[in-house]
Amino acid sequence: AIFRNATALKQTAASMPEAELRRALGIDAGSLEGWFAPDTYHYTSGSADLAVMKQAVAKQKALLAKAWESRSEAARVKTPYEALTLASIIEKETGLATDRHLVSSVFNNRLSIGMPLQTDPTVIYGLGEKFSGNITRKDLQTPTPYNTYVIPALPPTPIAAPTWASIEAAVNPADTRFLYFVSKGDGSSHFSQSLAEHNRAVRQFILNRPKTQKKAKPKEPQPTKETAR
């Protein structure tokens, strides 16, 4: 959509089937999602959109390769593409720089013990246009390839275009035993090792949140073992 809205670009990619576009961009994966590095790209009027896309893909590939080469032993992703996928989840879960490596630690810790990631952004992505804007228990139970409350692994593709900060965090998680986190309502998160501690945090930061704040945020599930994250 970003490229289509750039009216100064010569539109060449819009009419291409996605598989053909992936080949043209040198993307071996089965999806374009996640491969365009978020950045500012300079071009002249009349430039082909495909040329700018290639710049974005080349940058993302370079960033991913750089991160993969410096990954820590604590990283539980098995391939660069899995790292890109996890990075996209981190990107959607937090915009706070100080929380990225902590969020990464939660997901890497869960992957290491075969625990479902149970992350809402993947559910929302899987629902697509069916998502109402307020996540519900039914949404969490609706099976899609991206519902990480249902599947015990990473989703099949990224769900967003991650920045360098999220890519680096995905392969260099903080050294913690955290398995849960919950939004505190101010952009930061509270992290917990146990379900009991997490449920207390949910009561503190979600259930006791003023109604005006609750309306401003997507509804979060009640703290049960199946839906806690």
Give residue spans per PLM region:
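Short, local alpha-helical segments
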Residues: 145-154, 163-164, 183
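Small-residue-rich helix-loop
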Residues: 97-150
